[in-house]
Curated annotation (Swiss-Prot):
Biased composition (Low complexity): 121-148, 192-203
InterPro entries in alphabetical order: HECT_dom, Hect_E3_ubiquitin_ligase, RCC1/BLIP-II
One Pfam family from the record: HECT
Biased composition, class Acidic residues, residue ranges: 97-117, 149-163
Span list, region Disordered: 97-208
GO terms, molecular function: ubiquitin-protein transferase activity
Tree of life domain: Viruses
Protein name (Swiss-Prot/TrEMBL): Uncharacterized protein R349
Length: 964
């Protein structure tokens, strides 16, 4: 069975890695950030969903990021997977329409991608101020050699074997990373775009690509620019047009951006796609990210953030990266020098240019929102990635040299001594406990604590150091946590208790603490194997959260509480994000807790609960969102009259004749005459078709549990043309009724339509549905060939095929006949009409399209119940029918649905109505079914306690006659 092997958390989402390296996701999907729609009224995924990514055996998840707009996964082999919401703007993600991609099969045969830029762009942007920023042309003749060398060098370094794959929830089988889709660059501003080559991958900067550089020229940096340009032999055209920044005005230093490509390939619009390969490091902040690859830095911004994030960046050139018609953009930061080495340092990228002795820091600064920032400065002190720290709040860099501290000031673009440590201060630079992108400077002198951050609420001045407190525990302080009504001071002291109160503050000693994490209004920590939550909030419903609380202490402005998590077993590991903690208990059990605010959190309906992977992907492989059975447009409507007194032909024979007689562009309606009763509409039509299909089922198929095989003796009596018409009949019933067939055709038939052999995952899906007990028995032998042979099978795959009744026998003649009949049926099935979105389906989804679910979805049926009438007891009646539906066996529920709707399929867009009729005492009581309107009419006097058992018996007895 699938077991959880690793857990990653970020924001409001959880990523799970299974024992077979499959990836599952759960959490916030409000804006489709997980890559797919799960229903208009459901914004959270409350149990793990397989996202159709299975990593290679030698690959693993390195990092996981999520935000409101998209989700990203970075692997140890350098692959970045992005949810498609990144390029869909967080809007509605539509199911893929395969009919609009005629000829796209050829595109998927090989990967190709060329990146270029039009000469028009080069000419139009030369030395043209954009937003009052002077651009320096690096495409002048003096720079041609350098540009070619850079292009060649990158082309050599970046391999052409990167594959972009479409990954979606439920809708396609796992593909190997070697599979790829063709990518063709189209520069919409280039009239000769049709002639662009297609030999490069996304990341290859081809020679045809024009690099453009933009530098924001600030006060006192003209010398630096001159040095850079002279080193690169660049003609400093426009260098005198220096933009002088008004004193005190904030300006981002980001300024050297070039477009990195434009691609188009065939993929579906749901789920995840492989964005890049061979990526070294990622810097993620809120709703954008940078990544390093082959000593270059790239910037990626989701669709909805383009304008807001790039308004201060120049030059800004539109690029059209198109995946299945959706545009998106990413950018390359091109330095005006050869970068020797780019390092990743927690919250920034760093590179040093030895020729000019300039240090360069690339990160994000926060000014209401986050924006890209490029900081550069010259310094003679020894600086490296280990003694440099970046603050996003002030867009500043700290450098710690011994106990002296230097700080880069954005207002004068220089590195200056910030702390002249003549007093031998103990200087500590730590990430902010709540905002890891922000650094805090703590200085300790005896029992006095200072900081450059104004914790006390006075007017901030970045040039001053503030005294924070005087306390005996100051020498042991390693962090501060300021909450709305109390302060938690983090200390590390072997001689202190875990929690000590002093001077109106809480001192939290982590010396013996194995885990602690600050959340919105408290701290969760692990102490001696028990998990506690320290907060000033009194939790009203502790039982829901499985907590036991007590009042810990009184402070001047608040009361502090401590809550113990009541867990069924000891904690093995803890994973956390800003919104969640996930606990791994002994025995490989996992529990999640949304902890931003225990008292008001409504993120998950269950609030806290156990996480487990659904066994064997039984519920994970079918993607119902891309199923569309109404794929035909009918030009005419033909009315068919059927009299039940005429017994010359049964329903199957009538439907078979009808299939041969009607044009495939004609819609038919059924009018059934049964003695004096006349029925017409969708209900009688569905009932007639299902009756016909069932008659075919009993004659031409051999039934097992769910799966079937052909009755070869009966099929041998049919001509090839007749078998093709049978296939057309099946698809006609599906499309005309907008419903699946009431039977399950042999798996070989679905495989023939699908055009590919089933994967092991897909075979497991079918085998488990056919015989769950037998499947659980053989699953442990999946990776044990010897054990499989002891069970009497050649291989694990052979065992699965036997359970599925698919191509499993040694009888070659039987397999050949089955294959032939499937080909003929599939030809007729396709001839009637195309299957919408078939290219996005995996085999279980196609099987669902044809035959529907294996089991009736009671949850949808109950949620879509609508009861009217009997107003005084309406709620009581509704609850009674819900309990009744839940109590039925699968066969009884099928009979009820057949009576109610003329079909055994439950559709999420249907409303199932129960109408309570009030009549006089003298009126005859009864139950009537209205299949067209999906209604059951029940006389209220039948619902008293004396008749209720009779009502239930009638509901699950096949109905005679109809009301339509």
């Amino acid at each position: 069975m699938e077991l959880i092997s690793r857990v990653f958390t970020h924001g409001e989402n959880i990523l799970l890695v299974s024992s077979t390296n499959k990836l599952y996701i759960m959490g916030n999907n409000e804006y489709g950030s997980c890559g797919f729609k799960i229903g208009t009224d459901k914004t959270y995924i409350e149990s793990p969903v397989y996202i159709d990514i299975k990593l290679d055996d030698d690959d693993s998840v390195k990092a996981f990021y999520s935000c409101n707009l998209f989700t990203m996964i970075h692997t140890s082999k350098g692959k970045i997977y992005l949810s498609r919401s990144f390029i869909c703007g967080g809007g509605e993600i539509d199911a893929y329409d395969s009919e609009s991609d005629v000829g796209s099969d050829a595109e998927s045969d090989a990967e190709s991608d060329a990146e270029s830029d039009s000469e028009n762009h080069t000419q139009n942007n030369t030395n043209t101020p954009i937003n009052n920023i002077t651009l320096i042309n690096l495409d002048s003749s003096n720079n041609s050699t350098q540009s070619d060398n850079e292009s060649d060098n990158e082309s050599d370094n970046e391999s052409d074997n990167e594959s972009d794959q479409s990954c979606s929830d439920f809708d396609c089988g796992p593909r190997s990373d070697n599979e790829s889709d063709e990518e063709v660059f189209v520069d919409r501003n280039d009239n000769n775009s049709d002639n662009i080559g297609n030999s490069n991958s996304i990341d290859n900067e081809s020679e045809s690509m024009t690099e453009k550089a933009g530098i924001i020229l600030l006060n006192e940096i003209k010398t630096m620019v001159d040095e850079i340009l002279s080193q690169k032999n660049i003609n400093s055209v426009g260098i005198n047009d220096i933009v002088i920044r008004p004193s005190g005005q904030y300006v981002s230093n980001m300024g050297y951006i070039t477009e990195s490509g434009s691609v188009s390939f065939h993929t579906n619009k749901n789920g995840f796609l492989l964005f890049k390969s061979n990526v070294h490091e990622i810097l993620f902040v809120e709703e954008m990210f940078m990544y390093s690859k082959n000593n270059f830095i790239y910037l990626a911004i989701p669709f909805k953030k383009y304008q807001a994030s790039l308004r201060d960046i120049a030059p800004f050139h539109t690029i059209n990266k198109t995946k299945n018609g959706i545009k998106w953009k990413y950018f390359k930061i091109v330095f005006p020098f050869d970068t020797e080495k780019i390092e990743f340092c927690d919250n920034f990228f760093y590179t040093y240019e030895s020729n000019t002795c300039y240090h360069h820091v690339i990160s994000f600064y926060k000014n209401v929102n986050y924006y890209p920032s490029w900081i550069y400065f010259k310094s003679e002190i020894d600086i490296n990635s280990k003694n440099m720290f970046f603050s996003s709040d002030t867009n500043s860099v700290y450098v710690k040299d011994n106990n002296n501290v230097y700080k880069y000031h954005n207002f004068n673009n220089s590195l200056e001594k910030y702390i002249d440590n003549k007093l031998d201060l103990d200087v500590v630079i730590v990430p902010d406990s709540y905002r890891p992108m922000e650094m805090r400077l703590l200085l300790k002198l005896g029992i006095t604590l200072y900081s450059d951050y104004n914790f006390n609420g006075c007017e901030d001045d970045e040039e001053h150091i503030f005294e924070i407190m005087k306390n005996q525990y100051v020498p042991h302080i390693i962090g501060l946590n300021y909450f709305e009504s109390f302060i938690v001071v983090i200390v590390n002291n072997p001689n202190m208790l875990t929690i000590t109160t002093d001077d109106g503050k809480i001192f939290f000693n982590i010396h013996d603490i194995t885990f602690y994490k600050r959340f919105y209004n408290g701290i969760v920590y692990l102490d001696n194997g028990s998990l506690f939550y320290l907060t000033d909030s009194e939790i009203s419903d502790q039982n829901v959260w499985k907590l036991t609380g007590c009042q810990l202490c009184e402070l001047a402005d608040s009361t502090i509480y401590s809550y113990l998590f009541n867990l069924p077993d000891k904690i093995d590991e803890i994973y956390s994000s800003s919104e969640f903690i996930v606990l791994k208990l002994i025995g490989n059990k996992y529990f999640y807790y949304p902890v931003e605010n225990f008292d008001t959190a409504q993120d998950f309906k269950t609030r806290c609960g156990e996480i487990s992977l659904k066994n064997n992907s039984v519920l994970e492989l079918v993607n119902t969102s891309i199923i569309n059975r109404q794929s035909k447009s009918y030009h005419t409507t033909v009315s068919i009259n059927i009299d039940t007194d005429c017994t010359t032909h049964n329903s199957f024979e009538r439907l078979f004749i009808l299939t041969q007689s009607l044009s495939y562009s004609a819609e038919y309606s059924i009018r059934i005459v049964d003695d004096k009763n006349i029925g017409f509409g969708d209900g009688p039509k569905i009932e007639f078709c299902e009756s016909a299909i069932m008659q075919f089922y009993y004659k031409y198929l051999i039934a097992h549990n769910f799966h079937t095989e052909f009755n070869l003796q009966e099929f041998a009596k049919l001509k090839p043309t007749e078998i093709k018409y049978l296939g057309s009949m099946f698809h006609m019933v599906i499309c005309q009724n907008n419903s699946s067939l009431p039977i399950r055709l042999p798996l070989a038939f679905a495989v023939e339509i699908y055009g590919k052999e089933p994967t092991i995952d897909e075979l497991e899906y079918f085998a488990c549905n056919e015989d769950e007990t037998g499947f659980k028995h053989i699953y442990p032998a999946k990776y044990n060939p010897e054990l499989v042979k002891e069970f009497g099978y050649e291989s694990y795959e052979h065992c699965l095929k036997t359970l599925c009744k698919y191509n499993y026998e040694d009888d070659t003649d039987k397999n050949i006949l089955t294959k032939k009949y499937c080909e003929q049926l599939a030809a007729g099935f396709k001839r009637y009409g195309n299957i919408k979105n078939i290219k996005q389906m995996n085999l279980p989804t196609l099987d669902y399209y044809i035959s529907g679910p294996y089991k009736i979805n009671r949850t949808i049926l109950i949620n879509n119940l609508v009861l009217s009438g009997g107003k005084d007891k309406n709620n009581n009646y509704l609850e009674m029918f819900k309990e009744f539906i839940n109590s039925l066996s699968e066969n009884e529920l099928k009979i009820l649905l057949k009576n109610w709707t003329a079909s055994t399929c439950v559709r999420p867009d249907n409303k199932y109505r129960i109408i309570i009729i009030s009549k006089s005492k003298n009126a005859k009581a009864g139950i009537r079914f209205g299949t067209c309107n999906l209604e059951i009419h029940i006389d209220e006097k039948m619902l008293d306690e004396h008749n209720i058992d009779t009502v239930k018996e009638v509901l699950i007895t096949p109905a005679q006659g109809f009301k339509d």
